[in-house]
Amino acid sequence: MHEQYTPRDIEAAAQKFWDEQQSFAVTEQPGKDTYYCLSMFPYPSGKLHMGHVRNYTIGDVIARYQRMLGKNVLQPMGWDAFGMPAENAAMKNNVAPAKWTYENIDYMKTQLKSLGLAIDWAREVTTCKPDYYRWEQWLFTRLFEKGIIYRKNGTVNWDPADQTVLANEQVIDGRGWRSGALIEKREIPMYYFRITDYADELLESLDELPGWPEQVKTMQRNWIGKSRGMEVQFPYDQASIGHEGTLKVFTTRPDTLMGATYVAVAAEHPLATQAAQGNPALQAFIDECKSGSVAEADMATQEKKGMATSLLVEHPLTGEKLPVWVANYVLMHYGDGAVMAVPAHDERDFEFAHKYNLPVKAVVRTSAGDEVGSEWQAAYGEHGQLINSAEFDGLDFAGAFDAIEAALIRKELGKSRTQFRLRDWGISRQRYWGCPIPIIHCPSCGDVPVPEDQLPVTLPENVVPDGAGSPLARMPEFYECTCPKCGTAAKRETDTMDTFVESSWYFARYASPNYDKGLVDPKAANHWLPVDQYIGGIEHAILHLLYARFFHKLMRDEGLVTSNEPFKNLLTQGMVVAETYYRVASNGGKDWFNPADVEIERDAKAKIIGARLKTDGLPVEIGGTEKMSKSKNNGVDPQSMIEAYGADTCRLFMMFASPPDMSLEWSDSGVEGASRFLRRVWRLAQAHVSQGLPGKLDVATLDDAQKVIRRAIHAAIKQASTDVGQFHKFNTAIAQVMTVMNVLEKAPQATEQDRALLQEGLEAVTLLLAPITPHISHELWQQLGHAGSVIDAAWPSVDEQALVQDTITLVVQVNGKLRGQVEMPAAASREEVEAAARGNENVLRFIDGLTIRKVIVVPGKLVNIVAN
């Protein structure tokens, strides 16, 4: 065994062994417990960052631990390879997105392998390859024929200069990020998934996921947004609007109906269009609303603006005439594109009414009283007893809901209704680097799905986009085709699919990645699915995880899988954060400096109190800890860390520095500490092995000192097993290993029995570290005399007998204050313990002259003598 710990050589040798032995290739083994461990696959951006390293290390530790429990473990990896960054990089570097993507995959795959991940690389999937997306297209055609996918007009951000559609995040202050042109809202035909058909099931089956964080389930419940409310119709007539009809609104607060003082409609509402005829000012305002962002989050925070129309509607219960306003805070796609405004009890309506001097009428008695002041209070939105509401006065929310519904039904002007916030999922993207939508537009037959024998519709890979719309729409060689139904000239769809589609089913493809007769081999899929443990960032709590759940149900309904949910357990790992440093630039911005280029000064409590740039020695500002990012220049390159310290050190630091679901603060000194610890383990093992391996430990003849050492070993195994197996608390499991190391380093090695005990301790340390630091554990296991590989070794088991103490030390208190200790046989009776405590020399001094009133014995811990 080499005297020095040389991670580079040790890690290369271990990885070579795993590759040659195909150690992580798995096949279905009926009868053997399976465990499917999956970390969210990466976008091939070019280089791994520390967030990736943390994510994949957590997954790898879990996978290796489960293998040590004797399970058949699947841990695959792939690439979420379509998307906008590839198009942007292609334009910047004048290179085809395909070339850029495949080169990045090659580099990042090498990086992942250097971490020593226990991945079955034979199952690798790449979503931009036709052998992957052909099955996505196949499913699309099936769902289109069933009506689960449909086509309708949708509103998008249109850049008139670049002649292209922009994502919400590409619109900055109302202008295109590249062209700077003012963005317009446009209606274009798009394809949609009817995810709303599954809204109830997506909501209810969250209750079947006890292994998911409550926070994530709450976020999904809120996103689906099921609410029971009332559909209310406000009539209008010839005199008010020019024709008869009703304006439909949906409200979750029908109890406040008697407080409605105006109604507001979205800019796209038919009444807005009608009101704008002959009213240029209103038309200009409607156009302004239409040019704003289509993102709901932006609309929630933007300034509330509106314009009155000359139109009036009738209150359905009082007959009072209410003015119709066009308002930018009303969403056409929620409810019915119109709201009844109750300024006294809704904050948005309150703001709007105050801005435009509209009446405010309180109709609910809240904790703030019966009146509404000039400043909004949260209490105004509370449920309470109705006031100023005629025959409904005195009713609470539930009573008012029922009574007002009955009144509306009598007039045929309303009824209760369940509404969802969730909208159907629009998947059309006017981009090049995505999965082509397999539809042919025929002038005679309409929209025709591409027949299965003509799939995949292959994306040409030798294209360099120029940013001016989708190149596919300018490529007759791509879009010119014949109709599969009637044989006449037709045009292929040039939109591509939202890249969330690829990541919504990849977990199922891993079960049979080379299967060429369908999207999945149902037998293999049902063998492995659902995923036992899924690991990824909380930022995917809503969209990706909701779409993946939806797709799993679609696959179930196609007969491809039998389970209802894709992921049994979900672990959302925390961010990796690091210190930031900057100087204010001459233009008022900030120049950020990488922590590696900064020299820091700390106080006695290790808090950073000063920082200077190494190159010029001048001070820099301390920006505090933030998520590692390019924009703040506070990232640490994983490759440089692996080269300097080895993958095991990086893995150990990542697992020790913080519980996996909490933020992890990067610390160079923490990495140094992890490296020092592994060197200590190596040194102890090397010194032990160099003297020759000992014989078998004879547990029956251990002396008391040896029993203490063995107890420490097995206490650590017991605690680490609970920490890793039940709670994923890898940091506390590592702390247990460190405690054992402290004991083993001080343990005597004079006799054969001492050395046999050290052997047991080192084997336990190696096995407990094996999932976390697999390379050094691979080498140590062999050096400790084992013919098999540590990856095939079992997780250490606890010898409960080793934990039994022959003697125990009890604390003795007098009136709650520590006054002595007594050592007793573990099996001593209460009477014997009490007698020993009373007879303790030091205790006698404190009870001399006092009357003992009571003696409290807490078995195994303490004795408290109460005396006065």
UniProtKB/Swiss-Prot annotation:
One of its GO terms (molecular function) is ATP binding. It catalyses: tRNA(Leu) + L-leucine + ATP = L-leucyl-tRNA(Leu) + AMP + diphosphate. It is found in: Cytoplasm. One of its GO terms (cellular component) is cytosol. It is an enzyme of class 6 (ligase). ATP binds at K630. Its EC number is 6.1.1.4. The lineage of its organism: Bacteria, Pseudomonadati, Pseudomonadota, Gammaproteobacteria, Pseudomonadales. This is Leucine--tRNA ligase.
